[in-house]
Amino acid sequence: MLNDRKKKILKRAVMLIIIMLFFIIIGFSMLKYEVEGEKNMPFQLTKISIISTANGIPNTETLDRWNFNLVQNNDIYFNFEKNENYKEQESIKKISIENIKVLQSPLKGTTYFYRPSQQAVDWYENIEEARVTDKVEYQGNETSNVKELQVSNQGGIVGIRFAIEDLGTYVSEEEQITHDGLLLKSIGLKQEELKSKIAFDLVLELNSGIRYKAYIEQELPLDSVLEEGISKKEITDLNYVAFKRF
């Protein structure tokens, strides 16, 4: 009887240990997924590019040769590429930048977000029609057309602009000026007065119905914009960006 009782106790202890190990493994897997996200997505974010600079918006009611309201612009680009190691056939339905918010406002100026504009020479123009408050969506298409908010369904580039406006007035009688971050320095602005932090969700939706989302925070502008005029940064080590299904 005593041996039978010991065997039962031993069996229960072994079962309890097995159950505990099972839940520990499940918990560890969930924690790892929460931190690292998906590891074999059909399309991968391969690069984030940031360009910080500045320009002037003309003040029309003036006799000065140059009279500008200064704006500091930060253009952020996300490059998605097809994962050649993913064996299933997939295509992009849309890529969106959602839940856009300013976590830290600059000490000076007014902040806005902009989507690409058909009226812009390049991608962006700081006009009211192109302002976004919550999200910008790029629809999947056979080819990319950024100004039409279209991205190739096999991968492409999407972007958004974060602008700090109403930073001051630049007045000059010089023959020629260059529109860049040096204008900000010329009116006495300091980097710490521009320091900001933004956050958003980057969402990838496939035509199969699968959706992935990654939360991203970014400090802006880039540190050297006041000294170099135009500051650029490319981020390819993206382990901190964790896409998860939702």
Which residue stretches match the model-derived regions?
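Charged, low-complexity, helix-prone segments enriched in Lys/Glu/Asp/Gln
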Residues: 9, 194-196
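Non-catalytic macromolecular-recognition regions in eukaryotic signaling proteins
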Residues: 30-194, 205-246
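Hydrophobic alpha-helical membrane-insertion segments, chiefly the h-region
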Residues: 20-31
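N-terminal Sec-pathway targeting helices
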Residues: 2-21
